[in-house]
Design a protein with these regions (language model features):
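Structural micro-motif
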Residues: 115-133
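Short amphipathic alpha-helix with an adjacent loop that forms part of the alpha/beta core around
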Residues: 109-121, 149-152
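Generic recognition of short, well-ordered alpha-helical segments
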Residues: 84-87, 110, 143
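Non-catalytic, surface beta->alpha helical segment in thiol-disulfide oxidoreductase systems
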Residues: 131-160
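Thiol-based oxidoreductase modules, predominantly thioredoxin-like and allied folds used
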Residues: 95-111
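Local sequence-structure signature of Cys/Sec-based thiol-disulfide redox active-site neighborhoods
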Residues: 57-98
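N-terminal targeting signals for export/organelle localization
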Residues: 1-59
Length: 160
C-alpha cells in the first residue's frame, strides 16, 4: 500500500477522481456547490503536481555531490514533512538540492539508517533528511527548514 500512496501520480489522480465524483453528483442533483467543489478539487490536482515536483537522482552520485559542497536531501513520496519542505522551497532551491528517493534506492535507505544511527544511537529512516559535508539533520521543523533554505542559498553559485 505504501508504494501506491507514495507514487507521485497518486494524489493528483485521487484529486481528479474526487473532483469528477463531485461534478457528476452535483450535475445529477443539480447542486452548483458540488460542481464548483469538484472543479476546485480537479484544479488542485494540477497545482499540487507542479508544486511538489522534485527531480530524484541516483544515490550513486550523492557522495560526490556532498564532497563537492552540495546538499543531499533524502526523501520519500507521500511524506507530509517532505511535501511541506518542497512547497516552501523555491524552484531554484529545489534544483540546487540533490534529491534521493529512499523508496527507489534501497542502498540510500540503508545509508540513511546508518546516518541516523551514528547521530541518534539507533537506526531509523526519518525523512526529509539533509546531508552535508560535516553534518546531517532531519528537516521537520520551521527552524530546520529555514536552516536548509539558508544553506541552499549560500550554495547558489556552487554545483547543483
Amino acid at each position: 500500500m505504501r508504494r501506491i500512496v507514495g507514487d507521485p501520480w497518486f494524489y493528483p489522480v485521487l484529486f481528479v477522481a474526487g473532483g469528477l465524483t463531485f461534478m457528476i453528483a452535483g450535475t445529477r442533483l443539480q447542486q452548483v456547490g458540488m460542481i464548483v467543489a469538484g472543479l476546485v478539487l480537479a484544479g488542485y490536482a494540477v497545482t499540487y503536481r507542479w508544486a511538489v515536483r522534485v527531480r530524484s537522482r541516483p544515490f550513486a552520485g550523492a557522495q560526490a555531490h556532498v564532497e563537492g559542497g552540495g546538499v543531499v536531501v533524502f526523501w520519500r513520496p507521500g511524506c507530509p514533512f517532505t511535501r511541506r519542505l518542497v512547497t516552501e522551497l523555491t524552484a531554484q532551491e529545489r534544483e540546487r538540492a540533490y534529491w534521493v528517493n529512499i523508496w527507489q534506492e534501497p542502498a540510500a535507505a540503508t545509508f540513511l539508517a546508518g546516518l541516523h544511527e551514528a547521530r541518534d544511537g539507533h537506526p531509523h529512516q526519518a525523512v526529509p533528511t539533509a546531508w552535508l559535508r560535516r553534518r546531517d539533520y532531519v528537516v521537520a521543523t520551521d527552524a530546520t527548514r529555514a536552516r536548509l533554505k539558508d544553506t541552499l542559498r549560500q550554495r547558489a553559485g556552487g554545483d547543483a
